[in-house]
Regions:
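Conserved RecA-like helicase motor core of SF1/SF2 enzymes
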Residues: 540-583
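A short beta-strand element within the Helicase C-terminal
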Residues: 231, 286-289, 547-559, 591-593
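SF2 helicase/translocase NTPase motor core
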Residues: 51, 55-84, 90-119, 126-127, ...
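Inter-lobe coupling linker of SF2 helicases/translocases
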Residues: 200-201, 207, 211-232, 244-416, ...
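Conserved segment of the helicase C-terminal RecA-like domain
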Residues: 574-608
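Hydrophobic positions on the alpha1 helix immediately C-terminal to the Walker A/P-loop
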Residues: 142, 146, 286, 468
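Basic/aromatic-rich interaction segments and small domains that mediate binding to polyanionic partners
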Residues: 24-58
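Charged, non-catalytic accessory extensions
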Residues: 1-5, 34, 361-364, 368-483, ...
Length: 981
């Protein structure tokens, strides 16, 4: 067996992680982080939540070594309770065996393909990864798994997530809900409060180990240096493409973010994860800047050729993973994503609405035509006309608000940049603050008539665009969909809500805009998700930040975005991992409807020139390629051309319609050709780079075995479902099946368990599901869900702490053999640890021992870790029953679960159990050998995931595993051959 002596800390053996000690009148397990002066302890029969810290020198009674008590033969178990005891032990493990340390702390069941970034990370001394998976595949999950694994391996103690402001709260929730990590949000709004009262030698990032930091807050020169000097060991950067720097006028903010990341990456020992769905937008400088954050030599790929380039490309493949949904097929996981049905649905303005829109276009065209010599004034006036057009096309309410909002003539350069980004839908950093109506009012007297027309329309019925939306929603709701209507402006969202809230019978309608705080938005979404037939009206504050797949399955784009990425973001809120969808033709389906005005020349050109082109590139390449227009020069020129030539364009369109031609064509507009050429060039570059940098090293055959080992070590979905059914039924709170979900009444549970559940905000009657995606409105119950953990810990604590206890149905606790019918049900939370029954699964008397194995895992440069494992061994009588021999074939748990045969006489049952308990000391050599074999297997698992495909063995991966003896014998169960077998 591998020895850990050379890497073990200087601790007394009985203080080492995994050791048993006695203190304060009870037994404890020593947890990692212990020293001679400070012990981190978990009750022997308790949970991680009961852990405490004590100082041995301050204890009245000395802390002493302890041993695990053997089962008490006076409390005997039925087969049913023996199996429940085994399941409770399995579900209680948080520091489980297998190749990964963190899986016992995951609040979900990851898919096999999501293990790839984790395995890539474990092969690197310093983790530097660019994770560029498609929208909805699970980049947040993949990054969180890496962070949790490094934490649980003891390889880091702190980390920070850097992300745009609108994603801060989502990251805080995801880390807590999925990974049991309590992170602190750090934004411009709360940083001063967090810093208040801190000692001068500390700051936020030294006091709070886990932080989620707004990039807008931390990028400034005044804060950047302090963060870099005290930065945690791991940094996760979300939406990394917005931080990569760029050629041209990409904005001061992007360059500040890039400078920050460049300083952070200069520390060669810092772990960094970069997440983006669009790593390459056709801007070679930006893309290679991003690669340079992984390793400084990677930008040389631009200039190297031949073998030198191939070798560097091979090296990059260890740091870069990019997959689309079609790549998931080979992982046998493609069925987890729904089919997306899309449709472009035109509507036509008519009557007063058409007249008003034409008046606005005439006004805007005149502004463009009479542009003066002052370039800045000309630019701002044009942006004002675009803002007005967009608001008018959205709704009368947005038009009124825009016309009443005055554009400042004294804008700073940064304010101008912000206005430009909002007009062209260019920014991805401030979506929640981006849904207010754009200012359009100037000193031009021509606006007065437009204000009057807009106000008159606001009170009119028959809005053609609203009528078209109502028709689409009726169809969606009739087909069983739960839609989200995305619009561009707050005023439009409220306008639609007012018009639709009483339109559909039995439908619950709500509105969510950037006026609400992140917590208020989340609460409103959660409340609407509980409705039987929900309809949500939202601005783009929900196109990022809150996942909607568990309550909604359709998207309507009421307003076109000029940025195709924004459409993908909207649809990606529902079309993602975990979406249940609506079953159509046997397939889970989501639906997306894009509305556009067919007599609106701006909508027409956005649809034909921008959105359809983006879709075509995505379909051909497999990944999205953003429009290569960071400074919006192309879009600006395009819109000017459309306004100046709108009558000609309309005439061409009407002629095409008369000839039955469906697609628009603008071959004579040079600006359209320029945009098309630039975009095709960007797509070709992205296609080339996707081929060059594809991740092909880790294949399913190399990952699936690790996944299967983790499922065996910690339990999978079927194990969780079985345990919950058995435990809740035994405790009087049986599950009530409701289709794909279950109702769980918590009131019948013992008071101790109810109190623990209440502390986790679980009370009353729960609606739960054991599968992903869960039924709408149901909670997904996984192995680390509080319901499972509290049930498992409660049953174990009651059973392991009770040498002589009250008994439940089918069990007896006696000094003398009782009658066969003697039974009691006074404490169903107590499970017997010994039992005896007859079964056809064995031909000779056999003993199945349920064990908890404790190992100490020591890795170079890290604190020792405690690893626990639930296991079972079988011993079979030989030599006429004179001795027991270890069985090395088959699964002992299959024997334990095999159907029972006839009743065993009470006297024989008592004798068999007593004899087995008396032999426990004699079986210790067998148990010791088994534990050491399992320790060697654990070491092999640990080292195997460190083995690199073409990467040298690393110092960081060296490890040793030591079995902690004696083994904990949780249960002893005797199986006798059935009569006549």
């Amino acid at each position: 067996m591998n020895t850990a002596a050379s890497m073990a800390p200087d601790l007394p053996n009985h203080f080492a992680p995994g050791s048993l000690v006695r203190a304060r009148g009870r037994e404890w397990i020593v947890l990692p982080g212990a020293s001679e002066d400070e012990l981190h302890l978990r009750p022997l029969s308790g949970s991680e939540e009961d852990a405490t810290v004590l100082c041995p020198v301050l204890e009245f009674d000395p802390v002493a070594p302890a041993t695990f008590p053997p089962p008490d033969g006076r409390l005997r178990a039925s087969q049913e309770t023996a199996l429940l005891l085994r399941d409770a032990l399995l579900m209680s493990l948080r520091r489980g065996a297998g190749p990964f340390r963190s899986f016992g702390n995951l609040a979900f069941e990851p898919r096999t393909y999501q293990l790839v970034p984790l395995l890539m990370a474990l092969k690197l001394d310093v983790v530097r990864l660019l994770i560029a998976d498609d929208v909805g595949i699970g980049k947040t999950i993949e990054a969180g798994m890496i962070a949790r694994e490094l934490l649980d391996r003891g390889e880091l103690k702190r980390f920070a997530v850097l992300c745009p402001p609108h994603l801060v709260e989502q990251w805080v929730r995801e880390l807590d809900d999925r990974f049991h990590i309590k992170a602190v949000a750090v934004t411009a709004g709360n940083a001063a409060r967090l810093e208040r009262g801190l000692p001068a030698t500390d700051n936020i990032f030294t006091v709070f180990p886990f932080t989620v930091v707004s990039l807008d807050y931390i990028k400034s020169d005044s804060r950047r240096g302090d963060f870099v000097s005290r930065c945690p060991e791991l940094v996760i950067v979300d939406e990394a493409h917005t931080c990569a720097g760029s050629v041209g006028n990409s904005g001061v903010g992007r360059h500040q973010r890039y400078d920050l990341l460049r300083l952070l990456s200069a520390d060669a020992n810092r772990h960094m994860l970069f997440l983006t769905a669009t790593p390459h937008s056709g801007d070679e400088t930006s893309f290679h800047n991003l690669l340079g954050l992984l390793k400084p030599e990677f930008p040389q790929l631009q200039t190297l050729t031949g073998n030198a380039r191939d070798r560097l490309r091979e090296k990059l493949a260890n740091h870069f993973v990019q997959r689309q949904r079609v790549d998931i097929d080979e992982w046998h996981d493609s069925g987890i994503f729904p089919r997306r049905e899309t449709a472009n649905q035109p509507y036509a303005l008519s009557g007063q609405w058409e007249s008003f829109f034409e008046s606005v276009l005439d006004y805007c065209s005149a502004v463009v035509e009479r542009a003066g010599a002052d370039e800045r004034r000309q630019r701002l006036n044009f942006w004002g006309t675009l803002a007005l057009m967009r608001c008018v096309a959205s709704s009368p309410a947005a038009a009124v608000q825009a016309l009443r909002t005055r554009m400042s003539a004294q804008m700073t350069g940064e304010e101008e940049e912000e206005l430009r980004e909002r007009v062209f839908d260019g920014t991805e950093d401030s979506l929640p603050q981006d849904d207010g109506e754009l200012p359009a009012q100037t000193d031009d007297p021509g606006l007065a008539n437009l204000v009057t027309q807009a106000e008159r329309l606001l009170g009119q019925k028959g809005d053609p665009k609203l009528v078209a939306l109502t028709k689409h929603l009726e169809e969606l709701i009739r087909d069983g969909f739960a839609p989200v209507v995305f619009c561009r402006y707050i005023a439009t969202a409220h306008y639609l809500h007012d018009q639709l809230k009483s339109k559909f019978s039995g439908v619950t309608t709500s509105v969510v805009t950037g006026e609400l705080t992140p917590d208020e938005r989340k609460q409103r979404v959660d409340e609407l998700t509980e409705a039987d037939r929900p309809l949500m009206i939202a601005t783009d504050c929900l196109s990022e930040g809150i996942n909607l797949q568990h309550g909604f399955n359709a998207v309507v784009h009421y307003d076109l975005s000029w940025n195709p990425t924004r459409h993908e973001q909207r649809e990606g809120r529902v079309d993602r991992f975990g979406q249940e969808g609506v079953i159509r033709d046997g397939k889970r389906t989501v639906r997306a409807i894009l509305m556009w005005g067919n007599n609106n020349p701006v909508d027409a050109v956005v649809l034909e020139v921008i959105l359809k082109k983006a879709k075509k590139i995505r379909e051909e390449l497999g990944v999205p390629v953003p429009l290569p227009d960071d400074d919006h020069t192309l879009t600006n020129a395009l819109m000017q051309a459309v306004l100046l030539r709108r009558h000609e364009i309309r005439a061409r369109r009407e002629e095409a319609s008369r000839q039955g031609v469906l697609a628009l064509d603008f071959p004579e507009v040079p600006q359209i050709k320029a945009m098309d050429i630039a975009w095709v060039d960007a797509a070709e570059k992205a296609k080339k780079n996707r081929t060059v940098f594809a991740q092909n090293k880790l294949r399913p055959a190399g990952v699936l075995p690790e996944w299967e080992k983790m499922q065996a070590a910690l339990g999978q979905t079927d194990d969780v479902r079985r345990f919950a059914h058995r435990a809740l039924s035994r405790l009087g709170a049986g599950l009530e099946e409701r289709g794909r979900s279950y109702r769980v009444p918590l009131l019948p549970l013992p008071e101790m368990l109810r109190e623990r559940l209440f502390a986790e905000n679980l009370h009353g009657t729960l609606k739960i599901s054991f599968t992903q995606p869960p039924a709408i409105g149901a909670r997904f119950v996984h192995r680390s869900h509080p319901l499972v953990g509290i049930l498992a810990d409660g049953l174990l604590e009651s059973s392991l702490n009770t040498p002589v206890v009250k008994v439940g149905a089918g069990e007896t606790a006696v000094d003398e053999p009782p009658s066969a019918t003697e039974a009691s049900s006074s404490d169903p939370a107590v499970l017997g640890r010994t039992g005896c029954w007859a079964t056809q699964a064995v031909q000779r008397p056999s003993a199945v021992l349920l064990l908890r194995l404790r190992h100490q895992l020591i890795t170079q440069g890290a604190d020792p870790l405690l690893v626990e494992e639930a296991a079972a061994i079988a011993l079979v009588a030989t030599d006429g029953g004179q001795r027991m021999e270890l069985v090395t074939t088959g699964d002992p748990l299959d024997w334990l679960a095999a159907p029972t045969a006839e009743e065993v006489a009470d006297k024989l049952r008592v004798e068999q159990v007593a004899n087995a308990l008396a032999e426990l000391d004699n079986w210790q050599p067998l148990l010791k050998n088994f534990a050491e074999e399992r320790a060697n297997a654990l070491l092999a698992d640990h080292e195997r995931v460190r083995e690199a495909s073409g990467v040298r063995a690393t110092v960081r991966g060296r490890a040793a595993v030591r079995a902690l003896l004696p083994v904990d014998v949780i249960g002893v169960f005797i199986l006798l051959p059935a009569l006549g077998f």
